[in-house]
Structure formats: structure tokens, C-alpha cells
Swiss-Prot record:
GO function terms (MF aspect): acylphosphatase activity
Catalytic-site annotation from UniProt: R22, N40
The protein, known as: Acylphosphatase
Keywords linked to the UniProt accession: Hydrolase, Plasmid
Gene: acyP
């Protein structure tokens, strides 16, 4: 991973299921040119792996706090991840 590229594993909690959060995440990630995936978790949260240029990852982390209409974000927790784990393009995994 070059120094201007990074990856983050993100857990978003609140009202984030049943509000098209995964579709919204994919659309936002594609606009920013990010690679990765997003999925619903059984505890009602959403997990995403985002990878790309540092500035785009930072913008996506900010965007997660807004979410799509109908979402109510309680927390956005992120940790450093390896961009090697991110597939090319962006997909919804479940």
C-alpha cells in the first residue's frame, strides 16, 4: 500500500438496516473511487471495508455519519486494515 492509499474496516451502528444503507454505501464508494465491500451484521450493525486514496477514505468515513435518508447513526468505529483484503471495485456481500 502506498503512503497515499489506505484501507479501513468500519462498523456503523444505529438505525442502519432497512434504510438502504448498503446500496447508499456502494453508490458513495463508487463516486469516490473506493474498493471494498459492505454487509449487514446479525446484531443490526453494518460493516464495511473501504480502500483507496487517503482523501477518499477520509471523505467516506465522514459520509458514514450522514448515511442515507432514514438512517440514524449512533457510531462509526474504524480501524486500520490492509488494502490487499479489498476486492477491486465495490460490492455488497450480504
Amino acid at each position: 500500500m502506498t503512503k497515499d492509499r489506505r484501507a479501513a474496516l468500519v462498523r456503523i451502528t444505529g438505525r442502519v438496516q432497512g434504510v438502504c444503507f448498503r446500496d447508499w454505501t456502494r453508490e458513495e464508494a463508487e463516486k469516490l473511487g473506493l474498493d471494498g465491500w459492505v454487509r449487514n451484521e446479525s446484531d443490526g450493525s453494518v460493516t464495511a471495508l473501504i480502500a483507496g486514496p487517503d482523501g477518499a477514505v477520509s471523505r467516506m468515513l465522514e459520509n458514514f455519519w450522514k448515511g442515507p435518508p432514514g438512517a440514524s447513526i449512533a457510531d462509526v468505529a474504524s480501524e486500520v486494515a490492509s488494502s490487499v483484503e479489498a476486492p477491486a471495485g465495490f460490492r455488497i456481500t450480504r
